[in-house]
A protein has these predicted regions:
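Bacterial N-terminal signal peptides that target proteins for export
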Residues: 3-13
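Buried hydrophobic residues that stabilize the cores of well-folded domains
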Residues: 28-243
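C-terminal motif of bacterial Sec signal peptides marking the signal peptidase cleavage site
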Residues: 22-25
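Short hotspots in intrinsically disordered terminal tails
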Residues: 2-3, 240
């Protein structure tokens, strides 16, 4: 699978082209009572490689910390919030990446100033309502890289940049915690810049085609998402805590 525009410290191999995130909580019906559920463990398996993310939340239900190990190194990601500003610090004990993120009134990411050593990456998102229309990325004040997006019936269905075009398809189920866009953005940003009406079912980037399938429990929560491209299969599974 390919996670677009992911952070350099993000080990998901679904990485490549755009950057994204959704709300971490979901609702579960149990008799006449409703429970609020949050993803606390994400296990990403590709071939013989496995990465596990352990996630905690603050009292407001926002992601607070995230720990994972990849490439023989342990990473700690800390999220802090002040008004419309979100700060994200990702460290392996030697190097630290800092993101300063500004959110709009819909809670969507407008700007992300990412500092990696002496490198500054600035991402600016433009919306029509809650639909991402354009994303501009600039590194160290250099030449801007622009991606534009198209939407159909509340779903992101296409993107175009100087490197090519991509198309996206969806199933008929409403988007929820644990679906493709949701988990990409939760793990990387704790906030969103793409919110779709339905769950991503597949996409094509150039000649690469990926099919995305979901596993649900008996309450309807997503417990795993599987990406298949040719002979490559990646499975991301979840554990929840419910109150």
């Amino acid at each position: 699978m390919y996670f677009y525009g992911m952070k350099n410290t993000h080990p998901f191999l679904l990485a490549a082209f755009l950057c994204l995130f959704l709300a971490p909580s979901c609702s579960k019906k149990s008799g006449s009572s409703a429970q609020t559920c949050q993803i606390i463990t994400v296990t990403d398996q590709l071939g013989t490689g496995t990465t596990t993310y352990n996630i905690t939340y603050n009292n407001s239900g926002q992601i607070s910390t995230e720990q994972y190990a990849t490439g023989g190194q342990n990473y700690n990601r800390v999220f802090t919030y002040l008004g419309s500003t979100e700060m994200i610090s990702t460290s392996n004990g030697t190097n630290t990446v800092i993101d300063s993120v500004t959110l709009n009134s819909d809670g969507l990411i407008v700007t992300d100033y990412e500092t990696i050593g002496t490198t500054l990456n600035v991402t600016t998102n433009t919306y029509s309502g809650t639909e991402l229309q354009k994303q501009v990325q600039v590194q160290n004040g250099g030449t801007p890289s622009t991606t534009t997006y198209t939407w159909t019936n509340g779903d992101l269905t296409g993107s175009s940049s100087s490197t090519g075009t991509s198309t996206y398809t969806y199933n008929t189920k409403a988007s929820e915690a644990g679906d493709y866009w949701s988990i990409v953005q939760l793990v990387n940003y704790g906030s969103s810049f793409v919110k779709t009406a339905h769950q991503l079912a597949g996409y094509q980037i150039g000649t690469t085609v990926e099919n995305v399938n979901y596993t649900y429990d008996n309450t309807g929560k997503i417990t795993a998402v599987t990406g298949t491209s040719g002979t490559s299969v990646e499975t991301i599974s979840y554990q929840y805590t419910c109150n």
